[in-house]
Every structure is written in structure tokens, then in C-alpha cells.
């Protein structure tokens, strides 16, 4: 394998300005997200507290991810199909 000489990277003024703009944008998004969490936390729909019961926590997770569990039937025909003994 041929080895190349290292290429020199130069930092330009445009690169620095772009970095600063992106960093400011990320900081404003983070502050907005924190503000929403603070407002949502007072309604009870924000972060899950430690004192909440497991059913409500489970229900909040189900609502958040959109999972709708279907109960499984407990009869033998559903477990073994149409096999006869």
C-alpha cells in the first residue's frame, strides 16, 4: 500500500463563523427543549416521577411509542394449533 503525505487542513474564517452559528442554534434548541420540559413537567405529562405507580408509567411508555399490546388467549387450541391428542 502506498503511503501519502499528510495533507494540511487550514481553518478559515468562514469555517469559524459557520461553527459559531451552528453552536448558537443548538444552544437555542436546547433551551427551548428545556423550557418545554419544565412546562410539561408541571402538567404531569413531562418526565416520569419516581412516585408514579407502575401502571401509569407503563401506560405512558405505551402511548409514547405507539405500542398496543393484544392479550393472548389462554386456551389450549391457541397454544398448540389444531393438533388433536
UniProtKB/Swiss-Prot annotation:
Q: Where in the cell is it found?
A: Nucleus
Coiled-coil residue windows: 7-38
Instruction: Kindly list the GO CC terms recorded for this protein.
Output: anaphase-promoting complex
Q: Which domain of life is it from?
A: Eukaryota
Which residues get modified to Phosphoserine? 42, 82
Q: Tell me which UniProt keywords the record has, alphabetically.
A: Cell cycle, Cell division, Coiled coil, Mitosis, Nucleus, Phosphoprotein, Ubl conjugation pathway
The segments labelled Disordered in the record are: 30-85
Please name the pathway. Protein modification; protein ubiquitination
Which InterPro entries does the record cross-reference, listed alphabetically?
Answer: APC_suCDC26
One Pfam family in the UniProt entry: ANAPC_CDC26
Tell me yes or no: is tRNA processing among this UniProt entry's keywords. no
Q: Does the keyword Cell cycle apply?
A: yes
Q: Name one GO biological process term.
A: protein K48-linked ubiquitination
What residue spans carry the Polar residues bias annotation?
73-85
User: Record's family?
Assistant: Belongs to the CDC26 family.
Function, in words: Component of the anaphase promoting complex/cyclosome (APC/C), a cell cycle-regulated E3 ubiquitin ligase that controls progression through mitosis and the G1 phase of the cell cycle. The APC/C complex acts by mediating ubiquitination and subsequent degradation of target proteins: it mainly mediates the formation of 'Lys-11'-linked polyubiquitin chains and, to a lower extent, the formation of 'Lys-48'- and 'Lys-63'-linked polyubiquitin chains. The APC/C complex catalyzes assembly of branched 'Lys-11'-/'Lys-48'-linked branched ubiquitin chains on target proteins.
What do we know about how this protein assembles, alone or with others? V-shaped homodimer. Interacts with CDC16. The mammalian APC/C is composed at least of 14 distinct subunits ANAPC1, ANAPC2, CDC27/APC3, ANAPC4, ANAPC5, CDC16/APC6, ANAPC7, CDC23/APC8, ANAPC10, ANAPC11, CDC26/APC12, ANAPC13, ANAPC15 and ANAPC16 that assemble into a complex of at least 19 chains with a combined molecular mass of around 1.2 MDa; APC/C interacts with FZR1 and FBXO5.
Q: Quote the protein name from its UniProt record.
A: Anaphase-promoting complex subunit CDC26
Amino acid at each position: 500500500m502506498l503511503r501519502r503525505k499528510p495533507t494540511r487542513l487550514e481553518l478559515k474564517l468562514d469555517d469559524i463563523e459557520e461553527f459559531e452559528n451552528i453552536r448558537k442554534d443548538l444552544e437555542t434548541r436546547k433551551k427551548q427543549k428545556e423550557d418545554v420540559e419544565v412546562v410539561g413537567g408541571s402538567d404531569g405529562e413531562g418526565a416520569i416521577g419516581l412516585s408514579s405507580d407502575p401502571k401509569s408509567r407503563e401506560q405512558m411508555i405505551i402511548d409514547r411509542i405507539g405500542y398496543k399490546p393484544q392479550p393472548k388467549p389462554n386456551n389450549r387450541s391457541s397454544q398448540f394449533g389444531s393438533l388433536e391428542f
